[in-house]
Amino acid sequence: MQLVFIRHGLSEWNALNLFTGWRDVNLSEKGVEEAKEAGRKLKAAGFEFDIAFTSVLTRAIKTCNLVLEESDQLWVPQIKTWRLNERHYGGLQGLNKAEAAAEHGDEQVRIWRRSYDVLPPVLDPKDPNSAHNDRRYAHLPADVVPDCENLKVTLDRVLPFWEDQIAPAIKAGKRVLVAAHGNSLRALAKHIEGISDEDIMGLEIPTGQPLVYELDDNLKVLSKRYL
């Protein structure tokens, strides 16, 4: 069984070196090209999909659409869920990473970005840019909408969707594409690959590169490769 992950193409804020998180930022021109090229690679390699899963953030949705369009599969059903959103970077969202490092120190910012269980500063729920003020999350209980997350909390958010939707689809023989974000995909990778809390700090998933997993019947990883 195969599973394909793709992190969204380079976003406008990736290009500006800003913390993005749940802020809804568009793809950059380079990101659009990355997504299109990913679709062409998948088509050339003969990949066909039965279902696609993505987040409710524009950069991932557009990446999913472009990948499917370039591989002549735009008709494939898509399920969008907040559970595949990027990790919520709390009060860091919108800040320049270099400026944050200058203010808080390189090591503190590295820990905020890469550690498994250290939380970043909390974003005030009353902030105009808080997800509490975004109608795409209006159906969620207020205590479910995050104000900041680490990777552990992100995994706790993503895992129920993996178990309820993605894993059953794979076990049913469906060919699955997951177009999401660096940290939601890192969380899923940690789970399916059995990566330790320490080693996950070193895992980087590049933008716009299809990551192909070969899985056994129990969804254990047999191999992984980038196209």
From Swiss-Prot:
Q: Which residues form the signal peptide?
A: none
Which residues participate directly in catalysis? 8, 86
Q: Where is this site: Transition state stabilizer?
A: 181
Q: One Pfam family from the UniProt entry?
A: His_Phos_1
Annotated SUPFAM superfamilies? Phosphoglycerate mutase-like
- Give the metabolic or biological pathway: Carbohydrate degradation; glycolysis; pyruvate from D-glyceraldehyde 3-phosphate: step 3/5
Asked if the Swiss-Prot or TrEMBL record annotates the protein with the keyword Isomerase, the reply is: yes
Instruction: Write the Enzyme Commission number(s) for this entry.
Output: 5.4.2.11
Catalytic reaction equation(s): (2R)-2-phosphoglycerate = (2R)-3-phosphoglycerate
State the UniProt keywords alphabetically.
Gluconeogenesis, Glycolysis, Isomerase
Which biological process annotations from GO are given for this protein? gluconeogenesis; glycolytic process
GO terms for MF: phosphoglycerate mutase activity
Binding of substrate occurs at 7-14, 20-21, 59, 86-89, 97, 113-114, 182-183
Could you tell me which CDD domains the record lists for this protein?
HP_PGM_like
The record's top EC class is isomerase
Report the family membership. Answer: Belongs to the phosphoglycerate mutase family. BPG-dependent PGAM subfamily.
User: What role does this protein play?
Assistant: Catalyzes the interconversion of 2-phosphoglycerate and 3-phosphoglycerate.
Assembly and binders = Homodimer.
What is the name listed in the Swiss-Prot or TrEMBL entry for this protein?
2,3-bisphosphoglycerate-dependent phosphoglycerate mutase
> Species name for this entry?
Actinobacillus succinogenes (strain ATCC 55618 / DSM 22257 / CCUG 43843 / 130Z)
